[in-house]
């Protein structure tokens, strides 16, 4: 059985990256929550 995590930086940033977060309203809400929480990293 193959492992479920197959690392791929391009896919990672396409799905979880800053620009993809900014491109939708809910993504912006995610960033807002993470800022208010004081996260060092906002997105992948």
From Swiss-Prot:
Keywords: Ribonucleoprotein, Ribosomal protein. GO terms for cellular component: ribonucleoprotein complex; ribosome. Residues 1-44 are annotated as: Disordered. GO terms for biological process: translation. GO terms for molecular function: structural constituent of ribosome. This is Large ribosomal subunit protein bL34. Residues 1-19, 30-44 have a biased composition (Basic residues). Gene3D superfamilies: 1.10.287.3980. It comes from Bacillus pumilus (strain SAFR-032). Belongs to the bacterial ribosomal protein bL34 family. It comes from the Bacteria.
